[in-house]
C-alpha cells in the first residue's frame, strides 16, 4: 500500500475497490461484445459468458434492486452449440430494465439452460411487472419493445434459413390466479446437433 492509501478511510477504500471491480467487469463486457460483434454466430458458452458479465455489471449498479441466478445443465456442451451472437442478453436486459426496475421492491431474474430431447432451452424468467404494465408506464413506448422482439425474431428466422437450425422464440406473460401479472418468461429453443 502507498502512504496515500494508508490515510484513506476504510469506507473510501471500499468505494475505490467497488469502482475498480465495476470498471474491470465493464471493460471485460465491452471487450467480449466487440470480439463477437462481427460474428454471425458464437458458441452458447461465449453467449452465456457475455450474459453473466452483463448481469454481474447491472447487479453491481443496482445491488439492492434485483437478484439473479444462472442454472446450467452440466450435461450440455456449451462450446459445441452455436447460437446467433447476442441473442439472449437483450432479454435479460429487458427483464431487468422493464420488468424489475419499475417494481418498488425489486425482483429476480433466473436464467436457465436445459436440455429437452434434442433441444436446448434458454429460459429468461423474471418476476417483474410484466409486459402489459411495462407498456403502460410513461417511460416506456410500445414501439421500443415490439421493435426489439421483432428484430430478434427476424434474426432467428434468418439464422434458421441459413443454418436450418429450427430455433424458436416464445414469450409468456405470467399471471396469477386473479389474472394479475407476475412477470415474463422468454424461451429460446435451439436444436442440438
Region spans (language model):
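Two-component histidine phosphotransfer core
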Residues: 1-168, 172, 178
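Hydrophobic core positions in the C-terminal catalytic ATP-binding module
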Residues: 109, 176, 182-190
Amino acid at each position: 500500500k502507498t502512504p496515500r492509501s494508508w490515510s484513506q478511510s476504510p469506507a473510501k477504500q471500499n468505494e475505490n475497490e467497488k469502482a475498480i471491480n465495476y470498471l474491470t467487469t465493464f471493460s471485460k463486457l465491452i471487450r467480449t461484445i466487440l470480439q463477437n460483434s462481427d460474428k454471425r454466430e458464437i458458441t452458447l458458452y461465449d453467449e452465456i459468458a457475455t450474459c453473466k458479465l452483463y448481469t454481474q455489471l447491472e447487479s453491481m449498479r443496482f445491488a439492492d434492486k434485483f437478484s439473479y441466478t444462472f442454472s446450467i445443465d452440466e450435461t450440455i456442451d456449451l462450446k459445441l452449440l452455436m447460437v446467433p451472437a447476442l441473442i439472449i442478453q437483450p432479454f435479460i436486459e429487458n427483464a431487468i430494465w422493464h420488468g424489475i426496475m419499475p417494481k418498488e421492491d425489486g425482483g429476480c431474474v433466473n436464467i436457465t439452460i436445459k436440455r429437452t430431447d434434442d433441444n436446448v432451452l434458454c429460459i429468461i424468467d423474471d418476476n417483474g411487472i410484466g409486459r402489459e404494465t411495462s407498456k403502460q408506464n410513461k417511460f416506456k413506448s410500445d414501439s421500443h419493445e415490439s421493435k426489439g422482439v421483432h428484430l430478434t425474431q427476424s434474426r432467428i428466422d434468418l439464422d434458421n434459413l441459413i443454418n436450418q437450425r429450427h430455433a424458436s422464440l416464445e414469450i409468456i406473460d405470467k399471471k396469477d390466479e386473479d389474472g394479475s401479472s407476475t412477470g415474463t418468461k422468454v424461451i429460446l429453443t435451439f436444436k442440438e446437433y
